Amino acid sequence: MAINIEYVILRHLQMELKAPFTTSFGTFQTKEFILVEVVDCDGVSGWGESVAFSVPWYSEETVKTNWHMLEEFLVPLLFSKPLRHPAELPERFAAIRQNNMAKAALEGAVWDLYAKRLGVPLCQALGGTKKEIEVGVSIGIQPTVDDLLQVIERYVAQGYRRIKVKIKPGWDVDVIRDVRRAFPDVPLMADANSAYTLADAKRLQALDEFGLMMIEQPLAADDLVDHARLQPLLKTPICLDESIRSYDDARKALDLGSCRIINIKIGRVGGLWEAKRIHDLCAERGVPVWCGGMLEAGVGRAHNIAITTLENFALPGDTAASSHYWERDIITPEVEVHNGLIRVPNAPGIGYDVDRRQVERYTQFAKLFHRTATA
């Protein structure tokens, strides 16, 4: 089936978070991002969302660099020759080094359009089978431990299946001890966002007594070797996040023994197709995966739901309800969580309608690219 895209619209949005979100590398009060719309010759739209932040804390990509890459390189490549399947895009985009989040935003929009043209949900187009998915919640660093415990209590009461707590040096062992004392049976994990080095191995070993599901990305964001040295020293499984940017990174991590779990983020690895390839590799190796979050708005959240329907997404992901982050999301209906579960939508494409009124409200500026102008 030919995918005849006539034009692409890039929109720069800014949305206010309901509460500040703090990690070991910074605090977010607003989220800027690029919303990508691709429109075919029949006027059908597909939607994608860039997950890059406005500053290069998580990776080298930012909203501004993503816009530049999309405008100058990726959109022209999309229009450069006929397209029959979204899985062709990774090879087409391979001439552009890195810039995975920009690639994923455009590829995701094409996947949404492709599924709509087939008349099937995006999850089905990807090979997913689940009708509902288990989700957890990620909680940023709080002003005090009491504040953290209150936030956790609220989300446990709402039925979330897993609690993730951000840690950093000085906010780690004692904090996790207090959390575990207050919530002895809650599935719990810690996310370090690369805040430690191998010199901190004993401090990280001290977390073993708390029965954590995993510790996420304790060491450097580009490291596999030191994680392979650290993992045998810990009872707690290491989960890699920032270190895994491709199928090859995942293969090397598994070969080295750098981790026992992998967090898959669509934007970080360059798109849905690469995410699926990593999922399939981990399934073959018996390594569970889960879907991480990047403070996505509704479109990105919908893509996360779709990929999580693949069988080896065996652990609850970070795809919390829209209301966890936003007063008003950009999709209808908004993503809702009931007893720790999200029901997977069965409408074609991402399964949610984009609320153009809300998109307009949050849009700072936009630009349209027509096939004939870029071909």
Curated annotation (Swiss-Prot):
Record SUPFAM superfamilies: Enolase C-terminal domain-like (SSF51604), Enolase N-terminal domain-like (SSF54826)
Pathway where it operates: Quinol/quinone metabolism; 1,4-dihydroxy-2-naphthoate biosynthesis; 1,4-dihydroxy-2-naphthoate from chorismate: step 4/7; Quinol/quinone metabolism; menaquinone biosynthesis
Active-site feature positions: K166 (proton donor), K265 (proton acceptor)
Record key words, sorted: Isomerase, Lyase, Magnesium, Menaquinone biosynthesis, Metal-binding
Cofactor(s) the record lists: a divalent metal cation
GO biological process: menaquinone biosynthetic process
Entry EC no(s): 4.2.1.113, 5.1.1.-
CDD domains the record matches: NAAAR
Pfam families on file: MR_MLE_C, MR_MLE_N
Temperature dependence as stated in the record: Optimum temperature is 55 degrees Celsius.
Cofactor: how and how many bound: Shows highest activity in vitro with Co(2+), Mn(2+) and Ni(2+).
Domain of life according to the entry: Bacteria
Residues annotated for Mg(2+) binding in this entry: D191, E216, D241
GO molecular function: isomerase activity; magnesium ion binding; O-succinylbenzoate synthase activity
Reactions catalysed according to its record: (1R,6R)-6-hydroxy-2-succinyl-cyclohexa-2,4-diene-1-carboxylate = 2-succinylbenzoate + H2O; N-acetyl-D-methionine = N-acetyl-L-methionine; N-acetyl-D-phenylalanine = N-acetyl-L-phenylalanine
HAMAP family associated with the record: MenC_2
Function in brief: Converts 2-succinyl-6-hydroxy-2,4-cyclohexadiene-1-carboxylate (SHCHC) to 2-succinylbenzoate (OSB). Also acts as a N-succinylamino acid racemase (NSAR) that catalyzes the racemization of various N-succinylamino acids, including N-succinyl-alanine and N-succinyl-phenylalanine. Can catalyze the racemization of a broad range of N-acylamino acids, including N-acetyl-methionine, N-acetyl-phenylalanine, N-carbamoyl-methionine, N-formyl-D-methionine, N-formyl-D-norleucine and N-carbamoyl-D-norleucine.
Family: Belongs to the mandelate racemase/muconate lactonizing enzyme family. MenC type 2 subfamily.
Self-association state and partner proteins as the record states: Homotetramer.
Name listed for the protein in its UniProt record: o-succinylbenzoate synthase
Organism: Geobacillus kaustophilus
